């Protein structure tokens, strides 16, 4: 039995490698399959990837690798998975995907998404094998300073206050059950809301790594309020991505591996929240009664997978319109814009700069509300080879973090990284540099502040006799 367990990581790594090799070698055959068979293959790939990540990481279902894979699959492969499993789609969404799903470009989009999942899983598995399976790190890190947790709680409180204050001043109807469209028309995408959400995420990553106490409890309670408010008008990712980052950070420095029941309960609760929010975001809570809400997740999961269409559109640009590869330009745009700002060169506003992949998509399809996709951006820049290399690198990076138990600083940094990666699951990469710089800088400043040596006590001035 022990030999069987010892050989499991190697077997999973070989299985993932076989899947990746088959996807590369059999690419023409896969692209020529009927849609129903492509959906079935995508379902098998998703199951293999999630099983591999869950079994190889010491933190199981709360590892960074597993949760990132889950989100990547949820936003890119949930349509083919739901269709393969015979799930029932909402009438309006079924009519919507009927206008584009099933073409050869969509088949290649599904293939590219599977390639990304397999590349990430394979790299993740081999790093785990190289580091010796799923044994936990032997040396526990030092405890988190209470002041570090309190700083995180203060940041969460500040971010939630700014976010709610903005809603009260600019869009009070959202607090009375407004819809997601009202959110987009008023405060969605504004710098204030985006900045407040980032502050909440950074603060939550810092507070989550602390020991149980008032500060950590307060941070999670405030984030709970933030979650209820954002979910009430359908802004699901505003709460989802910080929550994933906070959970990953907390698990990364936990003294014990979270119980399977706890992990499953957290994931199921998150998926059910997505199910409910997906159904009420069109009308808001004010226009949705209990009879309009169903806990059957299949339709909601499929709607979440609409990000796949952004991949299909980029495939159309490259294949049908012969658009040349961008060779990394969209990834370098934040750096170029920062240089233009520093040197005083003219530049368009960020939401109108077509050098950003998401802006380019919006300018070509103004009715889209799908953000973008890391798979689409990698393919736009470097083709299918770029997709495989990029996601293999991500898999190796996440496996390196998941292999060992981190101290409070390392876990908080992992949380910030997870937030940046989560954000790009359905968006372009333009916010990643600022997110990482801001988060890592705040954590560094907090650590320096807490590690300053105390000032020496002043010597009393002698009083003359």
Where are these regions (language model features)?
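Membrane-interfacial loop-to-transmembrane alpha-helix junctions, especially the N-terminal start
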Residues: 5-15, 60-74, 151-152, 213-221, ...
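Small-residue-enriched transmembrane helix-hairpin modules in multi-pass membrane proteins
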Residues: 180, 272-394
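Aromatic-anchored segments of alpha-helical transmembrane domains
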Residues: 17-27, 71-84, 158-166, 223-231, ...
């Amino acid at each position: 039995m022990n030999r069987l367990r010892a050989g499991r990581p190697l077997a999973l790594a070989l299985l993932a490698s076989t899947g990746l090799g088959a996807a590369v070698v059999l690419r023409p055959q896969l692209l020529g399959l009927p849609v129903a068979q492509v959906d079935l293959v995508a379902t098998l790939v998703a199951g293999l990837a999630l099983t591999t990540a869950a079994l190889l990481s010491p933190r199981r279902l709360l590892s960074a690798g597993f949760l990132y894979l889950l989100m990547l699959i949820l936003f890119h492969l949930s349509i083919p998975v739901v269709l393969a499993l015979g799930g029932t789609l909402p009438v309006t969404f079924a009519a919507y995907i009927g206008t584009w799903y099933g073409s050869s470009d969509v088949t290649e989009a599904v293939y590219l998404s599977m390639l990304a999942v397999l590349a990430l899983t394979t790299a993740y598995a081999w790093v785990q094998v190289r580091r010796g399976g799923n044994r936990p790190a032997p040396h526990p890190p030092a405890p988190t300073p209470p002041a570090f947790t309190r700083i995180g709680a203060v940041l969460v409180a500040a971010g939630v206050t700014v976010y709610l204050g903005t809603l009260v001043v600019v869009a009070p109807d959202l607090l009375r059950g407004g819809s997601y469209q009202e959110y987009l028309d008023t405060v969605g995408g504004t710098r204030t809301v985006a900045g407040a959400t980032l502050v909440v995420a950074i603060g939550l990553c810092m507070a989550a790594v602390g020991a149980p106490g008032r500060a950590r409890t307060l941070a999670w309670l405030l984030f709970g309020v933030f979650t209820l408010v954002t979910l009430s008008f359908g802004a699901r990712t505003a709460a989802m991505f910080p929550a994933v980052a906070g959970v990953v950070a907390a698990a990364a420095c936990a003294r014990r591996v979270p119980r399977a029941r706890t992990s499953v309960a957290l994931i199921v609760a998150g998926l059910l929240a997505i199910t409910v929010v997906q159904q009420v975001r069109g009308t808001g809570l004010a226009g949705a009664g209990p009879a309009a809400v169903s806990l059957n997740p299949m339709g909601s999961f499929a709607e979440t997978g609409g990000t796949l269409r952004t991949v299909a559109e980029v495939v159309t640009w490259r294949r049908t319109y012969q658009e040349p590869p961008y060779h990394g330009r969209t990834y370098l745009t934040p750096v170029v814009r920062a240089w233009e700002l520093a040197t005083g060169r003219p530049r368009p506003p960020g939401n109108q700069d077509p050098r950003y992949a998401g802006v380019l998509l919006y300018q070509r399809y103004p009715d889209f509300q799908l953000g973008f996709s890391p798979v689409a951006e990698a393919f736009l820049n470097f083709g299918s080879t770029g997709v495989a290399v990029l996601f293999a690198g991500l898999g190796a990076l996440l496996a390196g973090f998941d292999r060992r138990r981190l101290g409070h600083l390392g876990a908080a940094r992992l949380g910030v990284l997870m937030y940046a990666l989560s954000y790009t699951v359905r968006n372009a990469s333009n916010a990643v540099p600022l997110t990482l710089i801001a988060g890592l800088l705040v954590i560094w400043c907090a650590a320096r502040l807490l590690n300053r040596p105390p000032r020496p006590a002043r010597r009393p001035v002698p009083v003359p006799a």
